[in-house]
Regions:
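Auxiliary Fe-S-binding modules of radical SAM enzymes
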Residues: 110-236
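Conserved AdoMet/S-adenosylmethionine-binding subsite of the radical SAM
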Residues: 1-143
Length: 236
């Protein structure tokens, strides 16, 4: 058939794992040597992670933030399961790791990239890390991506100080943060971390009612006004 690999990526492929497993089984009946890739945000149970390790050939694992407030503000979920799973994957599935990845979101998580790198290095300094630029989308459609200079600065600092042996970075997306978002972030009291406040401001302006961004327990989770289909319509 001329296919040597198949990859499952975002949204988050692990929520469809039973169907993915079935698809992989059918593919391997025709192509026993086909490679199977996963690109994941890392938020899953250990049981699911173990199944992913058994099923796939390689994994790209993304850590969006190191600070819990920042991770909640960006994703609506705590960071602890992600860090736990990152460590488990490194210790128990090192041969499956294609790369760890983090995106640079200016003013939100860009001061945490080195923390993420040091966390990975503390487990295994040979794990590759890819640092890529945020591109405005979804709830952060109007938030700027990093400049080329900022990407270069972060990449060099991480490469020099984190202890990781394999760090790559590249890309940029220059814009500016709107005054309305900055003013909203200043008014928020439910989070103390400045990056978390900035990320939460976008959700609040889109209609999010949660002060802690715990989406799993939110009464509006099935009809959330911040679950934007057309984020460019936000008046920011």
């Amino acid at each position: 058939m001329g296919v040597d690999r198949m990859s499952f990526t975002g949204g988050e492929p692990t929520i469809h794992l039973p169907y993915i497993r079935e698809a992989v089984e059918h593919a391997r009946e025709q192509m026993p040597e086909v490679g199977v890739g996963f690109a994941t945000n890392g938020f899953m149970s250990l049981n699911i992670l173990q199944q992913v390790i058994q099923l796939c050939s390689y994994v790209t694992f993304e850590i969006k933030a190191f600070n819990d407030d920042t991770h909640r503000a960006i994703t609506g979920a705590p960071v602890e399961p992600v860090l736990r799973n990152a460590e488990y994957l490194i210790r128990n599935g090192r041969g499956r790791i294609r790369a760890f990845r983090t995106i640079v979101i200016p003013g939100i998580n860009d001061e945490e990239i080195e923390d993420i790198a040091e966390f990975i290095a503390s487990i295994d300094p040979t794990v590759p890390l890819r640092i890529i630029p945020f591109r405005p989308n979804y709830i952060l459609y109007y938030h700027p991506g990093p400049t080329s200079a900022r990407m270069e600065e972060i990449g060099k600092e991480v490469s020099k100080k984190s202890g990781l042996e394999n760090v790559w970075w590249g890309g940029y997306y220059p814009m500016e943060i709107s005054k309305r978002v900055i003013e909203t972030a200043r008014e928020l009291k439910s989070m103390n971390h400045k990056g978390a406040k900035l990320a939460l401001a976008y959700s609040r302006l889109a209609g999010c009612i949660s002060s802690s961004r715990n989406c799993g327990e939110c009464p509006s989770r099935t009809n959330c006004p911040a679950a934007l289909k057309e984020p460019w319509l936000l008046d920011l």
